[in-house]
């Protein structure tokens, strides 16, 4: 009975399970057949990415700017290091006019000597070139100008001469030019250190005279031979093309050889031939700039070429000899000696002023806004008076010494 009851129980449970499974299947089928399946959730709208669109443009701009600055930097390096070796770039130096003072050699011939970075001339060579005062000359000298600064020469100004081409400029102007160049500012003729030999020592230059034996030998020359008397010519040059040719003619006061055979003139570019008949001839040795170097403007159509070239020539004679032969139209030895002593003492004056401290003008300021009275310090005024007295005594002594040497 127990077994039959168990069988009955299992059969009842199985039947109940079958019925329940059938009901669930029917509900699922009905549900799936009557209602549609749920739709998937919509995808979010795509957002526009501004960063991704700007990235290519930014990259292009950065690349262009990088290339531009790189080229600029390379160009600056080229100008700084390469061009300066050719002598065409100015740089600063401690002199008066912002041009570098290079040391260690000078430009000689076609190459650079001593490791110089430009084609300028050594400072010692520049300072050895002759100088003279413009006020020591007379004649048609009004309106003459410096070809570098285009300023007219004043009587108190100091000029420096280039011995070969015999062009004169302000000392500051030509020194500044020659610090970076090795040629004349006008004719571009090369200035070599050997040019100093054309001038030599000023004292020996002006004190040189014929001895009696030499004068006798000159007077006893046989007929038919010519005697060469050196003629000294030192020229100033100006850049005013509109100046009258009459003012730019050669300043020359010729002296007769018969009157005083002892007097003569040294020459840089020509010699004076005097034959036995007493006639004088001037023979050029082609050192003049216009004769030596053909300018590019030679192709210009000029009606009167000689008068045009005469506008750019102005010669100044430096003569030596007896005191009676000294002329106001010439640069005298005393002028050069006085000039050199004055230039040396001017440097001493600057040194004394520097030792006395930074002197400031005693008085009110220029703008009159501060109202602060500026006074001298460190005893600058007594030092200046002492230096002035020393300079005056030295100049008087040098002038007397030069006058006695000329006599």
UniProtKB/Swiss-Prot annotation:
Q: Which reaction does it catalyse?
A: S-ubiquitinyl-[E2 ubiquitin-conjugating enzyme]-L-cysteine + [acceptor protein]-L-lysine = [E2 ubiquitin-conjugating enzyme]-L-cysteine + N(6)-ubiquitinyl-[acceptor protein]-L-lysine
Q: What is a single Pfam family found in this protein's UniProt entry?
A: zf-RING_2
Q: Which GO terms describe its molecular function?
A: transferase activity; zinc ion binding
Pathway(s) annotated for this protein in UniProt = Protein modification; protein ubiquitination
Instruction: Give the transmembrane region(s).
Output: 57-77
**Chain segments annotated as coiled-coil in the UniProt record:** none
PANTHER family recorded: E3 UBIQUITIN-PROTEIN LIGASE ATL42, RING-H2 FINGER PROTEIN ATL43
State the similarity comment.
Belongs to the RING-type zinc finger family. ATL subfamily.
About its domains, the entry says: The RING-type zinc finger domain mediates binding to an E2 ubiquitin-conjugating enzyme.
| The protein, known as | RING-H2 finger protein ATL43
- State the organism named in the record: Arabidopsis thaliana (Mouse-ear cress)
Q: Which gene encodes it?
A: ATL43
